[in-house]
Amino acid sequence: MKKLFLSLFALLLLSFGFANRAQADEYLRIGMEAAYAPFNWTQDDDKNGAVKIEGTNQYANGYDVQIAKQVAKALGKKPLVVKTSWNGLIPALTSGKLDMIIAGMSPTAERKKEIAFSNSYYTSEPVVLVNKDGAYANAKTLKDFKGAKITSQQGVYLYNLISQLTGAKQETAMGDFAQMRQALESGVIDGYISERPEALTAESANSKFKMIQFKKGFDVNEEDATIAIGMRKNDKRLEQVNAAITKISAKDQVALMDKMIQNQPV
């Protein structure tokens, strides 16, 4: 019995050592979908400053990736992207698989119950993407979508904004924006709510799409419109991360986003 106890104790120490080593190595493991251009996407080479995706021969790039590189540099680490589904990001962070989430994530009150957030590194504007030749192509206000079948991404604040489109039909939330684009093109939906950079990306990729912006747009909480870095609550590097973000001015953020929109895959 004593030998069994000692063996188990040794195994626990060994496991603890591996966990510490994983956290203490040269890499900063960043979680993202790598499927939400221009914030993050997957590509086959390291062109335009892309970062390796762990466990694959592919690379990630986009606005989030470039922010991740600057944060990693400030922490004396090398960035390494861990491709993770949206709903799996927070569990992966809290379990220690990720060091940080840099994935276009808003610091909502609900998420703050589980993880900590840095200062904002981008502020988003919600828009609606429709078919250029569709019934809602000339929409000007939130009241111009009566009868429209509208959706957005599951688990994202954008989906809750559908109720602000007067008379619109709230369709089932979808897993990612690639699904939404396909559904829009095929006529399954009449439109979806997105953030301006993603909608611009969709327009560039498909000439059949049209982005609808509003002079008086959605009523959005500041915590939803801003995007921040997700970290574990006990991570003592938060101050360093905030210092790195502070060095990126609002002007630089806009310039970087415009550059990523140009570089994104079509």
Task: Locate predicted features.
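Periplasmic-binding protein-like
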Residues: 34-35, 123-130, 204-245, 262-266
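Hydrophobic/proline-rich hinge and linker segments of small-molecule sensing/allosteric domains
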Residues: 29-41, 117-139, 229-231
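A ligand-binding cleft/hinge motif common to bilobed small-molecule-binding domains
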Residues: 88, 104-113, 161-164, 190-223
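Ligand-binding clefts/hinges and TM-proximal coupling segments of bilobed small-molecule sensing domains
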Residues: 157-171, 243-266
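Flexible hinge/capping segments at coil-to-helix
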Residues: 48-49, 132-149
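Ligand-binding cleft/hinge of the Venus flytrap
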Residues: 43-55, 68-76, 155-176, 181, ...
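Short helix-initiation/N-cap motifs at beta->coil->alpha
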Residues: 63-65, 80-91, 137, 172-186
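Extracytoplasmic small-molecule ligand-binding "clamshell" domains
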Residues: 24-104, 113
